[in-house]
């Protein structure tokens, strides 16, 4: 699977699909730049009257709920419906679901209205979705946009968390990509783990939003499962390499953020094969 997924980087850059991002104003610039770096063509169109046209023109649409402004809800709902109508891939990042009733209601609505291909979130967010759709009664105490300390993925809880991720993917007929120290990805049938986690990622804002957009770009040219895997691998390995360069130069998180996009720009199949730590959970 590692070699198979790695070939999608060149395929993405050759096709350069329009990647339509309905995202938040905190991270919009970094999201656009990381899509360009990995090989996509970003369009950050958010106005309701033009959403259907952008969905039809794009290879994929991404919905990010980070700054859930009132005037963003209608465009998100239009995108959810129209991607289903046009069979355009849809990636959802339900940022901070579980924190407020509004976010819970919008998440349920978007999932029910669409045929979402990938849902990308941290473990707290995925547990919240599992609870909203009656897949589990386990409560998760969300910490704003960040993962709760109780939900951090470790080698001790990986199997139970992976089992839940698979159950959510199966129930919602989608692919779930959970980012953390260890990434968990499942399409409801198979479960894959990525052990390239980089702690410095949590010291910059937007790393999760960027990852969602990268996965989205890959969704335009390959299956949701492969897109989630190669997107997560590319971002995780870039984080490792960016941290090394930061430490060599005795720099900090600001430089790490720049190096992260640099490493995404230079990412290729050879780097994936050299550094990728991808495992199938049996």
Curated annotation (Swiss-Prot):
Its cofactor is Mg(2+). Pathway: Cofactor biosynthesis; thiamine diphosphate biosynthesis; 4-methyl-5-(2-phosphoethyl)-thiazole from 5-(2-hydroxyethyl)-4-methylthiazole: step 1/1. ATP binds at residues 120, 179. The keyword Nucleotide-binding applies. It is an enzyme of class 2 (transferase). Signal peptide: none annotated. Its EC number is 2.7.1.50. Keywords: ATP-binding, Kinase, Magnesium, Metal-binding, Nucleotide-binding, Thiamine biosynthesis, Transferase. It comes from the Archaea. One of its GO terms (molecular function) is hydroxyethylthiazole kinase activity. GO terms for biological process: thiamine biosynthetic process; thiamine diphosphate biosynthetic process. Substrate binds at residues 44, 206. InterPro entries: Hyethyz_kinase (IPR000417), Ribokinase-like (IPR029056). It catalyses: 5-(2-hydroxyethyl)-4-methylthiazole + ATP = 4-methyl-5-(2-phosphooxyethyl)-thiazole + ADP + H(+). Belongs to the Thz kinase family. Catalyzes the phosphorylation of the hydroxyl group of 4-methyl-5-beta-hydroxyethylthiazole (THZ). This is Hydroxyethylthiazole kinase 2. It comes from Methanosphaera stadtmanae (strain ATCC 43021 / DSM 3091 / JCM 11832 / MCB-3).
